[in-house]
Amino acid sequence: MWHAGAARQPSPAAARFPAGTRALVKLLHLSRRLRGLHRYDDFVIERVYGTPIVVTPSVFNPKRLRTGEFFASRLDRALIAPDAEVLDMGTGSGVCAVFAAKCARSVIAVDINPAAVRCAGINALLNRVEDRMVVRHGDLFQPVAGQRFDLILFNPPFLSGEPRNERERAWRSNGVAERFADCLDRHLKRNGAALLLLSTYGDAATFLGPLRRRGHRISVFAEGRYVGERLTVYRIAPLDPQGVS
């Protein structure tokens, strides 16, 4: 069951400040959070809504940057049917794959970072969903060539540029939006859809542009508002869901 959100107007507080000021505040928040990441480049165990999640060095922490925790909190049995086959792309620690595996028949989690692949595998075992969750190494759809899914989850890099190390791959990359849009339909089942999480730290319009140009239907599925940041989960579906073959 899907719940599409209605369009929302800027809050009165936001309207009081010029766009340039809001952009500067947003940049300062982001730089402070990214500068502090070296402190967390260690083995830790986080609890995400009561679920233990191991985070190993160079793997994106779902609580420190909050996106993984927010996304995982939206994955439940009201959304994911018991017979669903799910793809979690850019899985990182595997937090969304673990939450999806509690509901779905099967989940494939993929990541380009070998450390993330190992970390997600640990979390599948830790949370006893290894019988329904498989982790693969590779870039975007490459590890699932020829496979289709009822639901595709993607928390993509939100900054453009060349990553300097494996950890930066979680939030910095080039050309991801175009490659994702090019291949999405070939990996969706009939009536399937993708959930895409984007942050105001990035440029949502730029990321959604290739999907719009290819005729996908885009709606707001969930939103979270924080100091200096808004997270939005978009539901992406083909213009003709019955036309996916």
Regions found by a protein language model. Give the residues of each.
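S-adenosylmethionine
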Residues: P114-V117, V129, V134-P238
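Residues at secondary-structure transition points
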Residues: P62-R66, T91, D111, A115, ...
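N-terminal auxiliary segments of SAM/dcSAM-dependent transferases
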Residues: W2-V48
